Design a protein with these regions (language model features):
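Conserved, structured C-terminal
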Residues: 2-179
Length: 179
């Protein structure tokens, strides 16, 4: 998420991107601070997610593009609301910005979701797989490249900009993936 011109959040889940970002910053001599924010994500997923989340924050949430977000506040609870999720049905992730208000946010969401049948749950692998979303370590890891995943359409090796791994990806494209 790009919160400001000079502030980005990466949702790292169980990946090594935090270490990667630190290594890039050190190797390039960048004047940046890389830290893990005190933020707690809460996902509202499924066919009624939009109704639940809009009943809390308002209809503007329907205008969010997929993977876009907006900062908001509800009952004094600071959050970032993102249109995203691990299901084909879509949903939202609400990033709590003040951990001391976690219980309040939980109760607020559960109350708003009650008329819609909202229940606590967990990530569902089949929903993720049906939605075509990969999970780091389960489906891919640091040794997996986009060509092995069938993501050729997402790789533009003709662009003028240089990026880390461009030469390696050119070689893989030319020789074909090993697996």
């Amino acid at each position: 998420l790009k919160l400001r011109e000079d502030l980005f959040w990466f949702s790292i889940a169980d990946s090594d991107i935090w270490f990667w970002a630190r290594a890039i910053a050190a190797e390039r001599g960048l004047d940046v601070k890389i830290s893990e924010p005190d933020v707690s994500p809460l996902a509202v997923q499924g066919p009624k997610a939009g109704a639940v989340v809009s009943s809390i924050f308002g209809d503007w949430v329907h205008d969010l593009k997929y993977f876009w977000f907006a900062e908001s506040e509800i009952n004094g609870i600071p959050v970032a609301v993102q249109r995203s999720g691990w299901s084909k049905q879509g949903g939202f992730e609400i990033y709590l910005r003040d951990g001391s208000k976690g219980d309040q946010l939980w109760e607020l969401i559960m109350a708003a979701g009650a008329p819609h049948g909202l229940k606590p749950g967990h990530t569902s692998s089949i929903r993720r797989i049906e939605g075509g979303m990969l999970s780091y370590h389960a489906d891919a890891d640091i040794d997996t490249n986009p060509f092995e995943l069938g993501f050729d359409r997402l790789v533009n090796l003709d662009m003028d900009a240089e990026f880390i791994g461009k030469a390696a990806l050119r070689k893989i494209k030319q020789e074909g993936p090993m697996r």
